[in-house]
UniProtKB/Swiss-Prot annotation:
Gene: ARHGAP45
One GO CC term on file: extracellular region
Species of the source: Homo sapiens (Human)
Residues annotated with Phosphoserine modification: 23, 25, 73, 93, 99, 569, 578, 592, 619, 949, 1027, 1030, 1032
Superkingdom to which the source organism belongs: Eukaryota
F-BAR domain segment(s): 269-539
Protein's recorded name: Rho GTPase-activating protein 45
Entry note about domains: Rho-GAP domain is able to regulate RhoGTPase activity, actin cytoskeleton and cell spreading. However N-terminally BAR domain plays an autoinhibitory role.
UniProt feature, compositional bias: Low complexity: 646-655
Record's keyword annotation contains Coiled coil: yes
Span of zinc fingers (Phorbol-ester/DAG-type): 702-747
Miscellaneous comment text of the record: Infusion of lymphocyte from mHag HA-1-negative donors results in a durable remission in mHag HA-1-positive patients with leukemia or multiple myeloma.
Record's signal peptide: none
Subunit structure: HA-1 forms a complex with MHC class I HLA-A*0201.
Amino acid sequence: MFSRKKRELMKTPSISKKNRAGSPSPQPSGELPRKDGADAVFPGPSLEPPAGSSGVKATGTLKRPTSLSRHASAAGFPLSGAASWTLGRSHRSPLTAASPGELPTEGAGPDVVEDISHLLADVARFAEGLEKLKECVLRDDLLEARRPRAHECLGEALRVMHQIISKYPLLNTVETLTAAGTLIAKVKAFHYESNNDLEKQEFEKALETIAVAFSSTVSEFLMGEVDSSTLLAVPPGDSSQSMESLYGPGSEGTPPSLEDCDAGCLPAEEVDVLLQRCEGGVDAALLYAKNMAKYMKDLISYLEKRTTLEMEFAKGLQKIAHNCRQSVMQEPHMPLLSIYSLALEQDLEFGHSMVQAVGTLQTQTFMQPLTLRRLEHEKRRKEIKEAWHRAQRKLQEAESNLRKAKQGYVQRCEDHDKARFLVAKAEEEQAGSAPGAGSTATKTLDKRRRLEEEAKNKAEEAMATYRTCVADAKTQKQELEDTKVTALRQIQEVIRQSDQTIKSATISYYQMMHMQTAPLPVHFQMLCESSKLYDPGQQYASHVRQLQRDQEPDVHYDFEPHVSANAWSPVMRARKSSFNVSDVARPEAAGSPPEEGGCTEGTPAKDHRAGRGHQVHKSWPLSISDSDSGLDPGPGAGDFKKFERTSSSGTMSSTEELVDPDGGAGASAFEQADLNGMTPELPVAVPSGPFRHEGLSKAARTHRLRKLRTPAKCRECNSYVYFQGAECEECCLACHKKCLETLAIQCGHKKLQGRLQLFGQDFSHAARSAPDGVPFIVKKCVCEIERRALRTKGIYRVNGVKTRVEKLCQAFENGKELVELSQASPHDISNVLKLYLRQLPEPLISFRLYHELVGLAKDSLKAEAEAKAASRGRQDGSESEAVAVALAGRLRELLRDLPPENRASLQYLLRHLRRIVEVEQDNKMTPGNLGIVFGPTLLRPRPTEATVSLSSLVDYPHQARVIETLIVHYGLVFEEEPEETPGGQDESSNQRAEVVVQVPYLEAGEAVVYPLQEAAADGCRESRVVSNDSDSDLEEASELLSSSEASALGHLSFLEQQQSEASLEVASGSHSGSEEQLEATAREDGDGDEDGPAQQLSGFNTNQSNNVLQAPLPPMRLRGGRMTLGSCRERQPEFV
């Protein structure tokens, strides 16, 4: 192959002909062009490196896979630096490097031809070396000498290649070094003993690869077409990336020896042999295996943290690209819009692919396989270590036994020698003794002979034991050696498996990272080149060109004098800061003087006062006349006309002045006050002004809203409002724009007070502000629950939503009595009431009465149990009832010692719980259930250091028993005090008159007795009305009741008012009423027909939507607080 390439090169035109044809000749180093700033020229005297530079020893071996790119950075080598020799593609004659003093002359010099011949001679020597290597490896004879001979031929070929690359650095390319590394690996791994065809094919392929790579590089070098991106130029003096790194350390300028070639990678058998020969080889191998496990753990930790960062970066990039894409793509004609649109898409694709790649790395290719391999590695290492230590312990025991047997054997031999000496001595003494002493000497001799025989036997036994221990020690030693061989082989196998796993995982990781990051430079370069093509102002011109607008019309300015149409306008007389229904006259009377339109029909004269302080608040709007009792108002009642109002602040309010055609005011007017002088629920007008398009809550519609001008604190969410805020012109309430949907504080038409610390405060402080001693929060919650939640299943037992409960508590502290509860959940309201009572520092039933009340409950339970035991199977429950009555009597005596406000609030709350119990079939709340709920709340011991004391846990049933008894026997416990109402009630009204109303369609024998709920006894008498929201109830009521029954109901309502002197409250319109106004109404309509009272009450009994109609009820009989109704239907009477 090399000979054919040589002949082709000889046929190519010479360098001189190229120069004469116009090809550039070698130029001085100072004139060499720079290519993109990456190829620097070093003005050295020669391309050949100094001789001493080749003597620098390189460490390690450099092996590269054959699939690497031609780019130098892909092989792990940096591009040529400032001190490296590089040459661009424009240099056609790279054979010699002209120094500044040796500039080439015209034509082809003789040195050029000599360089070509020298290069071709070196290439021929390299080809011969490869041929010798091929013959040595593939020959079939001399099996023992083939390996060293092959390594010698390989070293000779690499030495020639190293000399060529040292002389011509431009030949040092990635392909050449990669092919050389592959050839070295194949030669070292070749099995010369076995005739394996697969290994021969791989060796021949590696040999052909290096020949093709080197010949191609030489051909490109001679043609001047060497690609600078494939060079591996090494700075002078740095040989760590040169040819020496392919085959390890060597001598200066000499090829490596056979030992140096073999030191790179020893066969597995040789590694085991080396470890077997050295002392502590198994321990060294085990230590390496242990360190390798730690190394894998560190690798996993590093890659896990790195992939986590990659994942976070990819997700963050996706997020910002997705968020910015919407805003960037809004305007169509922006500069470089397509560039950044493409960049955002590339970022999204990169982030998506990176997330997938990281997930693959974590689950499939790197972390999971490496983790499993580490665990298996540690398991096998520990097993091998245990087997090795077990073999060592056996050998140590054998050696110990051997030492003991040797000592015993030596001792027995010494004893035997001593016995033989004594026998010999006795024989000599016997021989030299006198004839008369022969018997004694004979006995002594016999004795010593016996001792000598015993010592001989013991010595023989010790020798046998010694020999056995020696044989056992040899056996254990051999077993240890066998275990050593097995352990070393297993350790190497485990290490090789772990190496293979690490290798495959690493290749997969970096290959995947290369696949992810390789397109990025191309994308960035493409974006850069595309950005260079943009002309400033191009997109702006395109935008202007696409605008399709009409020609701008000519405008003329002329002076127009003002002509006044009227001398008086009702709008000019409007008050500045607040709204009054009389400020705007009817549209027909716009030109009339003030005397004619000052007071309209149906509007009191006091309503025309123009000051805010003189405004009179009414509970019902006056837009519906007294005679209009239908659900649909007449044409004159519903036609309103809006007039714009000029505010002193320059802002629009949320409600506008509404005037009906008859002059009646359609805006909010109020006539009666609540605890603080304001009604808790105000009529709602149609929203308008700056917040008319917002979803306003029922309470928010009562405010006159304008835009917030200064930062303030939101009364709904208790955070500061800086932008997009609203405030009320009358009560100065500030609120976020978004909080208007859930605002629960109504307008009080005067400046709202600061926040009240309500929860957790002393009960006497809250009760001091109430005339009857019942705090407003208790009244609000109880009235709302009685209005619409008496029959709610699980009331007080089911908890509300925590967030809504907290907002309600905050609303009570901010708005006090002005909190709107009609849109709140009944369970939330009941939870607020329980929370208020639970957070009192001292409960309603004082601490000092706790032990007495609990003691009464214990005695009552004990007595009831004894009564049940005494009655045995009898059905009579009089004993239990007597026990309960006795307990109620004693409770009445104890509760007299409570403070007045505590007793009043407790009576108010128990009356409410009594009403809940009366409908327990619907709400499932029995007195026992309510006792369980309110027992620990109303009656608890004095707090101690423990969070929940044991005694309080034990007393829970007794607390529930006390509250259950108070609910069941409410009339007995509080019989001495009449029920009081906020409107006032005389004690003499305890006795009720008996009212009998005949029902025309009921039979005499059918009578049903209903308990009359004492709704007039407290501040929130419940009125039953029929709303448009329940069409079925309205139809049923209209079918059952006639006009005559409604007339009878009118007389009945006024009779009940005279007997109890209690004011009626309208549940749909407001929670409290004014007794004086009802009495005044009764006086005004008392002389009319019998439908007058009912119609007068129904005129005022309207809710915020003016869609409520009174429902006539069946006639009834009142006797002592109970109602007797002659009806065959179980129908509860309803009052209007």
